[in-house]
Amino acid sequence: MGEKQQPSMNDQLRVRREKMQELRDKGIDPFGHRFERTHLAAQLHEKYSDMTKEELDEQGVVATIAGRMISKRGKGKVGFADLKDRSGKMQLYVRKDVLGEDVYKVFKRSDIGDFLGVTGDVMKTDMGELTIKVTGLTFLSKALRPLPDKFHGLQNVEQIYRQRYLDLIANDDSMDRFRKRTKIVSAVRRYLDGNDFAEVETPVLHTQAGGASARPFITHHNALDINLYLRIALELHLKRLIVGGMERVYEIGRVFRNEGIDTRHNPEFTMLETYAAYFDFHDVMDETEGIFKAAVAAVSDDGKITYQGTELDLGQDFERLHMVDAIKKYAGVDFWPKMSVEDAKKLADENGIHYESWWTVGHIINEFFEEKVQDQLKQPVFIYGHPVEISPLAKKNAEDDRFTDRFELYILGNEYGNAFTELNDPIDQRARFEAQVAEREAGNDEAEGIDEDYIEALEYGMPPTGGLGIGIDRLVMLLTDAPSIRDVLLFPTMKPID
């Protein structure tokens, strides 16, 4: 005798539709209505798990729960099942002599994946498992497709991302990660709200792409007959609000960049940007550290986490290091002495650093950092003092105008935050925009254009301001030990199946 052959998918779909019709023939709606429950599974476990079988029998606790049936066993007149709701699962003990033949048959003919509502006595089995002995059963919704195999979960990575709902049903780790994401974002909001920042919403459709160096998505507004850009950053509208006197603002919103997809990039992602009048970049470092400590507290009691095997301590004070000092420390090259582009290119050649023909000294300093230093930064460190050439919206440093009052937060060689003392001089801002236009003409297709409306806003006066950008998805990846950005996006961008 060979193994019992599994029914084909077509057979399973047909049988489930037949069972749906059986319910209708009995006058039961296979896609039911509102159901009032008294408890979630976890509440029952929390309240009654420590009680003995006898204590529970004596108390006579009755509960009503609802959820998806994820397993079922038993023969004849007695059956067991596991019902899963958003909090966890609960075992059901179902007897024909308690429910009556008709209702018991509804249970027996139900499939894994169906939704049931049950009322019954909370008890413990002889094995000590908290269980509901069902006295009433309501059929709530028929699953016309079988769930992924419960023992193997959902293994196909492509299917996990395309059909996240199946992943959430099958993989508790995945559900837990997205719950943590919600807690992390809430913690960030609470921190900012508690520091008197106002949450605002700014336009997603822009007449000009700005605030970052990135390729935008372009769409067309039919009534106005103009092209619009999906925002590549939140920055320029938020700074207009600082001009308007709001003083402390933040936005958590979707941003869109028409670029490649990899483990750290998705075309649409969630950004946090904050702006505070009268802050400089040192104040923003303190703010950033506060945000990260608030976020990690949502998932860790002591500020320690492990990311892909490396233990990180986000509870400690974060190190602060100038980019030039970091290059000196990790690569042994000193960019403090002023030098010509030729001198910088010579240093690049000697150290095997790539450069483009149009680059200036600042671009080469940045490339040294990215190639020689970045990967060595493991524990949290603020790298500040970026060259002016790569920071078109940051204020120049008062002591050395080759550099800006800007920082990035690095953890495990990856950037988790970008901030600066904002450029509030409209004349300098125009010159920076014009330099970007020149770069674009020289071949940099990610350089920004001139935003005249933004310059006009600056001309009305913007107080000294500190600004910050944090990629929420990357923050969640870090705090939930997720190897890919797709693991923290409920519905990542996927190429359609033909």
Swiss-Prot record:
Its main location: cytoplasm. CDD domains: LysRS_core, LysRS_N. It comes from the Bacteria. GO terms for molecular function: ATP binding; catalytic activity, acting on a protein; lysine-tRNA ligase activity; magnesium ion binding; transferase activity; tRNA binding. InterPro entries: Aa-tRNA-synt_II, aa-tRNA-synth_II, aa-tRNA-synth_II/BPL/LPL, Lys-tRNA-ligase_II, Lys-tRNA-ligase_II_N, Lys-tRNA-synth_II_C, NA-bd_OB-fold, NA-bd_OB_tRNA. Mg(2+) 1 binds at residues 408, 415. Its cofactor is Mg(2+). One of its GO terms (biological process) is lysyl-tRNA aminoacylation. It is found in: Cytoplasm. GO terms for cellular component: cytosol. Coiled coil: none annotated. Mg(2+) 2 binds at residue 415. It is an enzyme of class 6 (ligase). Binds 3 Mg(2+) ions per subunit. It catalyses: tRNA(Lys) + L-lysine + ATP = L-lysyl-tRNA(Lys) + AMP + diphosphate. Its EC number is 6.1.1.6. Pfam families: tRNA-synt_2, tRNA_anti-codon. Homodimer. Belongs to the class-II aminoacyl-tRNA synthetase family. This is Lysine--tRNA ligase. It comes from Pediococcus pentosaceus (strain ATCC 25745 / CCUG 21536 / LMG 10740 / 183-1w). The gene is lysS.
